[in-house]
Protein backbone atom coordinates (compact mmCIF):
# COMPACT_ATOMS: atom_id res chain seq x y z
CA UNK A 1 0.00 0.00 0.00
CA UNK A 2 1.21 3.47 -0.89
CA UNK A 3 0.36 6.62 1.03
CA UNK A 4 -1.47 7.82 -2.09
CA UNK A 5 -3.95 4.95 -1.58
CA UNK A 6 -5.12 6.31 1.80
CA UNK A 7 -8.27 8.44 1.91
CA UNK A 8 -8.74 8.75 5.70
CA UNK A 9 -6.00 8.90 8.35
CA UNK A 10 -7.09 8.06 11.91
CA UNK A 11 -4.86 8.87 14.87
CA UNK A 12 -5.84 7.33 18.20
CA UNK A 13 -4.47 8.52 21.55
CA UNK A 14 -5.33 5.59 23.81
CA UNK A 15 -6.44 5.70 27.42
CA UNK A 16 -7.55 3.05 29.89
CA UNK A 17 -11.29 3.66 29.67
CA UNK A 18 -11.58 5.70 26.48
CA UNK A 19 -9.45 6.91 23.61
CA UNK A 20 -9.36 10.15 21.67
CA UNK A 21 -9.59 9.69 17.93
CA UNK A 22 -9.02 12.26 15.21
CA UNK A 23 -9.48 11.42 11.56
CA UNK A 24 -8.43 13.56 8.63
CA UNK A 25 -9.38 13.23 4.99
CA UNK A 26 -6.70 13.26 2.32
CA UNK A 27 -7.21 17.02 1.86
CA UNK A 28 -6.74 17.66 5.61
CA UNK A 29 -10.37 18.13 6.62
CA UNK A 30 -11.24 16.83 10.08
CA UNK A 31 -13.88 14.12 9.63
CA UNK A 32 -13.89 12.74 13.19
CA UNK A 33 -12.59 14.28 16.42
CA UNK A 34 -13.98 12.96 19.68
CA UNK A 35 -13.70 10.53 22.56
CA UNK A 36 -13.95 6.89 21.60
CA UNK A 37 -14.72 4.25 24.24
CA UNK A 38 -12.36 1.29 24.46
CA UNK A 39 -15.17 -0.95 23.20
CA UNK A 40 -15.10 -3.31 20.22
CA UNK A 41 -18.60 -2.52 18.95
CA UNK A 42 -18.01 1.25 19.11
CA UNK A 43 -14.62 0.92 17.40
CA UNK A 44 -16.22 -1.11 14.60
CA UNK A 45 -18.99 1.46 14.21
CA UNK A 46 -16.55 4.36 13.85
CA UNK A 47 -14.20 2.44 11.55
CA UNK A 48 -17.13 1.42 9.30
CA UNK A 49 -18.37 5.00 9.09
CA UNK A 50 -14.90 6.17 8.08
CA UNK A 51 -14.42 3.29 5.61
CA UNK A 52 -17.42 4.69 3.73
CA UNK A 53 -15.12 7.60 2.81
CA UNK A 54 -12.46 5.30 1.30
CA UNK A 55 -9.28 3.47 2.29
CA UNK A 56 -8.43 3.98 5.97
CA UNK A 57 -5.12 4.00 7.85
CA UNK A 58 -5.18 3.71 11.67
CA UNK A 59 -2.26 4.90 13.81
CA UNK A 60 -2.31 4.11 17.54
CA UNK A 61 0.16 5.64 20.01
CA UNK A 62 0.39 2.50 22.21
CA UNK A 63 -0.41 -0.49 19.97
CA UNK A 64 0.99 -3.20 22.24
CA UNK A 65 -0.77 -2.28 25.48
CA UNK A 66 -4.11 -0.58 26.05
CA UNK A 67 -4.30 0.21 22.34
CA UNK A 68 -4.24 -3.45 21.33
CA UNK A 69 -8.03 -3.67 20.92
CA UNK A 70 -8.12 -0.70 18.53
CA UNK A 71 -5.39 -2.35 16.44
CA UNK A 72 -6.99 -5.82 16.53
CA UNK A 73 -10.39 -4.50 15.43
CA UNK A 74 -8.82 -2.51 12.60
CA UNK A 75 -6.87 -5.55 11.40
CA UNK A 76 -9.97 -7.74 11.58
CA UNK A 77 -11.78 -5.23 9.37
CA UNK A 78 -8.97 -5.19 6.82
CA UNK A 79 -7.76 -1.74 7.84
CA UNK A 80 -4.04 -1.03 7.71
What spans do the regions from the language model cover?
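Phosphate- and other anionic-substrate recognition elements at nucleic-acid/protein interfaces
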Residues: 1-80
Amino acid sequence: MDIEDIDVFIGIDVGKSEHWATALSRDGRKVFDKALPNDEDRLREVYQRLQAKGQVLVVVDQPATIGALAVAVAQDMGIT
